[in-house]
Amino acid sequence: MAKKPIDPKIAAELSRLALMPDDEIDTSDAPEVTDWNRAIRGRFSTVSLDERGYDVRAIANWILDYLSEMRINASNMSLNKLIYFIFERGLVERHILYTPARVEAWNHGPVFREVYHAVKDNDDKPISDRISRYSVRDREMVEAREQFSADDMDFFKSVIDDYKDFTAAELRRISHRDDGPWDRVWKSAAPVNPGMVISIELILASAPERRDLDGRY
């Protein structure tokens, strides 16, 4: 049977996507790959989560906008930590999963790969630009934005207000607290997963419901 020729517009779009740099590829909805060989399984969570489905890059841009209003700068490291604290507290305190993006345990704490790569050229300098994503509808890179609910924005503000005066190093230390989610993944001797993913189940099992601003609980 003869193959049906590909529409020229679709072929051109596929060629464009094939040339897209790895840093611009959205992997936020990629399934978590877990190798349980010699690993200790985490406690099974029976908590029902409300999934918002927000793009983590849009959350990052919202944080940058909010900090800018207060004339506060954010670096790559501090931005990733602030997103993580929203992610963690949303799960623990509200049973809300704000983004399907995976959080990973890196050397300097929890990191969202999409955000890190988008602003990595800033190194440790303040971030001035906003993060973009590829729009299938518009066929171009656009600024990552979401229509956040008023309630969610109020929650985001409450978390950022708790941590806005901390330095990046202090936020890193808080995220590294003993026996916390990052600590459990980073120090695990077993090959729990290749991507060092900090799973939702692990966060619910090891993160405290409330903690002091310095990370103690």
Q: What spans do the regions from the language model cover?
A:
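Generic N-terminal leader/processing signal
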Residues: 1-2, 79
